[in-house]
Curated annotation (Swiss-Prot):
The protein's role, per its UniProt record: Catalyzes the transfer of a N-acetyl-glucosamine moiety to 1D-myo-inositol 3-phosphate to produce 1D-myo-inositol 2-acetamido-2-deoxy-glucopyranoside 3-phosphate in the mycothiol biosynthesis pathway.
Family named by the database record: Belongs to the glycosyltransferase group 1 family. MshA subfamily.
Organism: Catenulispora acidiphila (strain DSM 44928 / JCM 14897 / NBRC 102108 / NRRL B-24433 / ID139908)
Molecular function (Gene Ontology), one example: acetylglucosaminyltransferase activity
Keywords: Glycosyltransferase, Magnesium, Metal-binding, Transferase
Superkingdom in the source lineage: Bacteria
Oligomer and partners: Homodimer.
This protein's name: D-inositol 3-phosphate glycosyltransferase 2
HAMAP family in the record: MshA
UniProt binding sites for Mg(2+): Y309, R310, A312, T336
Keyword set includes Transmembrane: no
Residue numbers binding UDP-N-acetyl-alpha-D-glucosamine: Q20, P21, G28, R234, K239, V300, E322, E330
């Protein structure tokens, strides 16, 4: 690729790649940014990640990996700001980004890649100042989320919806996680189809790989003969962990003998620090009469998470909205079949009927039926596990980085062509 950028400014305002996934606002996007940046660096592209400083304990710049630098930008108080408060800090954040670039020779950054709409607002202004292409990844779409709200969940604010429209108009190219997201950008936001590229996220196939289930269960403290259902993610209405708990209660109500061996593991934390106890789920488990089968586990690092995937019989992903669903791919890479909602990118992440089962809607009874259909058919469960590994192998991060770098190259070439046409027109 002749037009490969030398250096990219990658913007992630609201969540740092150094944060533990599963805590606060840290999740799949954090994993995405870390892994993509590392693989881009492997291709010879330097990456500088700008993120809001949330503690004074870290230096202004931290080396994440060879060729990958994390820059902490002071914008508002370190603590006490929710994601919804951050629009008020975008001017300060943008100022910090522009000051950093001004310390270098002009043309220091060849391209901007912003992640989530907040970062897109910053990228829009930086693009105008620096005269470089802006690539934007939404990760989630406010209009899509509002169309599929969970009970008790708050709708995305108008500021976000308007901000997303602005970013779609400003970006030179948009990267969608799946073809469905690409079509939603065109249909709901009026994006030019020629400026939308689909690049599937990836999975670390070295870390997330099949292994000995008995050893994994011993590692995480689970009985060797248990029937283990696993939920991984932030504990919030959007991710619908309550659907899994209600499905487990339905399983036991249908067949009380399942209680003896059933284990439901919930790995993750609520918004905020992510380390608080999910008291509402504890109460729900008690009310459903299944507190004895549910285990709540605070967020764990990626290596430990792989053990949880390998220890599980089935990973359950009942989200109301997912632009892709990294949890589903990670679980499958470890050889664990998935029962997931038929929403968004999960239809791409899961090979329905081969590596898992997609469920229409969020009726706990339907999830109970899907789970029982695998637990009660060991040969089918094993076949799904083998197929899951094969399916996940298509989603390595190196392929994601190569496709992303191609989008970068085309954007740089487009800008050069535009400038050449303008030069010719002015002569």
């Amino acid at each position: 690729m002749e037009s490969l950028p030398r250096r990219v400014a990658l913007l992630s305002v609201h969540t740092s790649p150094l944060h533990q996934p599963g805590t606060g606002d840290a999740g799949g996007m954090n994993v995405y940014i870390v892994e993509l940046s590392r693989r881009l660096a492997d291709l010879g592209i330097e990456v500088e990640i700008f993120t809001r400083a949330t503690t004074g304990a870290l230096p202004p710049a931290v080396d994440l990996a060879p060729g990958v630098l994390v820059r902490h930008v002071t914008a508002g108080p370190y603590e006490g700001l929710s994601k919804e408060d951050l629009p008020g800090q975008l001017c300060a954040f943008t100022s910090g980004v522009l000051r950093t670039e001004a310390m270098h020779e002009p043309g220091y950054y060849d391209l901007i890649h912003s992640h989530y709409w907040l970062s897109g607002q910053v990228g829009w202004l930086a693009k105008e100042r620096w005269g470089v292409p802006l690539i934007h990844s939404m990760h989630t779409l406010g209009k899509v989320k509002n169309a599929a709200l969970a009970l008790g969940d708050d709708p995305e604010p108008t500021a976000r919806l308007v901000g997303e429209d602005q970013v779609v108009d400003a970006a030179d190219r948009l990267i969608a996680n799946t073809d469905q997201e690409a079509s939603e950008l065109v249909r709901l936001y009026g994006a030019d189809p020629g400026r939308v590229s689909t690049v599937n996220p990836g999975v670390d196939l070295d870390r997330f790989r099949p292994g000995d289930k008995r050893a994994a269960r011993e590692s995480v403290g689970l009985p060797p003969d248990a029937a283990v259902l696993l939920f991984v993610g932030r504990i919030q209405p959007l991710k619908a962990p309550d659907v899994l708990l209600r499905a487990a209660a339905e399983l036991i109500a249908r067949e009380p003998e399942r209680r003896e061996k059933l284990v439901v593991a919930v790995v993750g934390g609520p918004s905020g620090s992510g380390l608080a106890e999910p008291t509402h789920l504890h109460r729900l488990a008690r009310r459903l009469g299944i507190a004895d089968v549910v285990r709540f586990v605070k967020p764990v690092d990626q290596t430990r998470l792989a053990d949880w995937y390998r220890a599980a019989d089935i990973a359950v992903v009942p989200s109301y909205s997912e632009s892709f669903g990294l949890v589903a791919i990670e679980a499958q890479a470890c050889g664990t079949p998935v029962v997931a909602a038929r929403v968004g990118g999960l239809a791409t992440a899961v090979a329905d009927g081969r590596s898992g089962t997609l469920v229409a809607g969020h009726d706990p009874g339907d999830y109970a039926t899907a789970v029982a259909g695998l637990l009660d058919a060991p040969h089918r469960l094993a076949d799904f596990g083998e197929n899951a590994v094969e399916h996940a192998a298509r989603f390595g991060w190196s392929a994601t980085a190569a496709a992303t770098a191609d989008v970068y190259s085309r954007s740089i070439e487009d800008l050069r062509a535009l400038r050449y046409r303008e030069l010719c027109a002015g002569q």
